């Protein structure tokens, strides 16, 4: 007796039908892009259900018929109407959901997905690039990377293993398919993604902080295998001590397992202070007091002396017994345990790991060069090269052995032998410079990369779980010159700094510590970016204090505070108060619309002091015209003398001697002509025309 199954059940394996053959007719509607086939059932035959499985565009939909239980065969029904036929949309959605499930299950097992497989599975409705980006984003969040081509084993070496779970896959399918219908508003998308992460308890914060610490210690333990880095670190410490530099540039502190985990005194007071000071403090509210002052010099000196002692023993053991000797490994382990307790500054940490990466890049560059000559140019099989070359990077006899193994390509290998030997010599030189062989360089970098990845994942979890804290603090700083999204972005930067410097052993909750860093980042960004004209941070603090006292006076008296009152309250000279009030004014755009119709700008009403006013221009024009008219009543000689003497219609005036040379007479004669012309102009008939201009000038 066959078991009862739903009519829409789908089988993922091919099954042969038993009993009577079912008549199946498939009719595809052109509007359906998933290429699923509908089923029409014959009236006299048992009902059957078709199942379609879509693998790719190249494979046709496969139809499998399956007989229904006998209870369904007793009452053959009439041919179904259009309304009774299966809904194509529902079948397409179900098939699409199941197809996604199979794809995600396979992708989670492999850890990646190929872009072509994703496109083949999606219907044509998902051809929009924005929708495709959204789906790829959701897959990335699930831990599934999308590649253009299948990655090699090295790319997946550090990836975490993923486990397939039916319920989890079904949830992931729903999330991916829902991506298309979600909003594209960035704020809503950010809020939705932020809300999907659960808040952390105190215990959860400690667990993540320990994971961060474990990853950092793993990196520090790997660094010890490269002795030159330890020696360089010791030299930098000696330089800082000799020059009285800042220890915080080198160290933040030390990981101490025995450090007290008791709660600090009155953390509630600090929380309250953080909340009350959010409103008015505009400076570096969360200053760099957390982790920036550096460790205690005496404690640091003790740790460094111990480090120097262990490093000296390790170097002596290498010289006496060699790197692989048990005694040397014992000293190396002790050195690694001590050095892993050092909490380096971010700059110093990146400097040490950066040197290791540069070594690896140099080695990889030479290896790729050798592989290019052997595989690409000499046409030797890639698998043979990968099997033969490792552990023979600097073996100068390897090429001869490789030619014997590949006799068909021996001539081509001989052609590029000089280049291959040169690359091997470069690798040997790299080993000699760093006292490490190529395999050791790769192993150190592998351990460093794993430790960094572990620490980075834990930091990401801590940051995502505390994004709500940034929102709550950023809300208090709106309408201060920066948009809300910019405030969130700056607050998130402060949150990331807080995660880097958080010390769970002090007993504080992370939110108590991070609040100061978030506030500091937001207020600093407001001071730097909000104003068109940047004002120093200390002046911003003075302005905020002035505004706060001004509001208090207004609430107490109901009258705006005068500069004298503000000066008395702030113990500040009145002149400085006026200067601060002047600086506090915000610039206004000259393009600001004015009036109800907004048909004019503010710049149209601002006086241009460099331009002559219309009244002065009209007066000057009238005076010039009247002067020319009066001069026309004189003789040409007298008029020209006056014009030259007073610079009328000329660039400049002239002396008596200059005018005399012009007329070829003495300067005394020019003075007489000038005096006679001026007496004529003083006549009332002529002077009357100039009286009005004299009154205006007065």
Swiss-Prot record:
Binding region for DNA: 656-675
Residue ranges of the motif Interaction with polymerase core subunit RpoC: 486-489
SS bonds (residue pairs): none
Region (Sigma-70 factor domain-2): 462-532
Compartments it resides in: Cytoplasm
Region (Sigma-70 factor domain-4): 630-683
Location of region: Sigma-70 factor domain-3: 541-617
Biased composition (Acidic residues): 276-291
Record-level GO BP terms: DNA-templated transcription initiation
PROSITE patterns xref list: SIGMA70_1, SIGMA70_2
Keyword entries, A-Z: Cytoplasm, DNA-binding, Sigma factor, Transcription, Transcription regulation
Gene Ontology, cellular component aspect: cytoplasm
Region (Disordered): 1-88, 259-298
Role description: Sigma factors are initiation factors that promote the attachment of RNA polymerase to specific initiation sites and are then released. This sigma factor is the primary sigma factor during exponential growth.
Identification of the protein by name: RNA polymerase sigma factor RpoD
Species of provenance: Coxiella burnetii (strain RSA 493 / Nine Mile phase I)
